[in-house]
């Protein structure tokens, strides 16, 4: 793509994906609040052995990459404790905080920032990636592991929430209560573009 100047329309998908990522985390963790502590920590089939381990993995990877996008050098220290949050309440608060940091990054992006090289500290090496590619990588990572957690929820007393919808106009009333909890409006998510188009 070189030094192509991107319009706000081209930046919009990154904004909306960041909002969708935060919304999906909010929805999934809100459902998990109804789990018993035993259900939250019980061994289950998945890449990680429990809901707690899976959801904490999403959190620490978000910390790892968001710190790099902010220009930090946290690096592998992000993985020092694989399960920093012992409860769903603590996890929901911590995830919301890192989601806000990611939203702040994306809200501040312009075409130059989207093409900026991010230094990802990996211990003995520093990986250099463009911001746009790193954002897409992080969104895909979170989607992947939320899907695993969603499947694990099927084996509990809590019904898995719907996570397979995006921001369809006709479904705005269905997400209005969650947007209110998050302090969002449709116009905020869609930027200067008409939220109804």
List PLM regions with ranges.
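Long, intrinsically disordered, low-complexity Ser/Thr/Pro-rich regulatory/activation regions
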Residues: 180-197
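Active-site-proximal loop/hinge segments within enzyme catalytic domains
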Residues: 119
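Helix-adjacent hinge/juxtasegments
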Residues: 72-116
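Short, contiguous alpha-helical
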Residues: 8, 15-80, 122-185
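Extreme N-terminal tail/first-helix region
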Residues: 2-19, 189-193
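General structural signal for secondary-structure boundaries
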Residues: 10, 36-37, 86-87, 109-111, ...
């Amino acid at each position: 793509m070189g030094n192509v100047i991107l319009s706000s329309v081209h930046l919009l998908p990154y904004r909306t994906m960041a909002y969708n990522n935060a919304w999906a985390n909010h929805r999934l963790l809100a459902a998990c609040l109804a789990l018993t502590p035993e259900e939250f920590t019980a061994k289950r089939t998945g890449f990680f052995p429990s809901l707690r381990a899976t959801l904490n993995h999403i959190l620490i990877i978000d910390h790892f990459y968001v710190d790099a996008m902010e220009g930090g050098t946290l690096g592998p220290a992000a993985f020092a404790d694989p399960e920093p949050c012992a409860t769903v309440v603590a996890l929901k608060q911590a995830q919301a905080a890192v989601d806000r940091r990611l939203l702040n990054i994306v809200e501040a992006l312009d075409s130059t920032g989207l093409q900026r090289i991010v230094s990802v500290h990996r211990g003995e090496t520093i990986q250099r990636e463009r911001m746009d590619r790193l954002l897409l990588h992080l969104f895909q990572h979170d989607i992947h592991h939320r899907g695993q957690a969603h499947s694990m929820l099927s084996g509990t007393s809590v019904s898995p929430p719907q996570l397979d919808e995006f921001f369809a106009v006709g479904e705005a009333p269905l997400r209005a209560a969650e947007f209110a909890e998050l302090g969002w409006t449709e116009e905020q998510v869609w930027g200067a573009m008409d939220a109804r188009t």
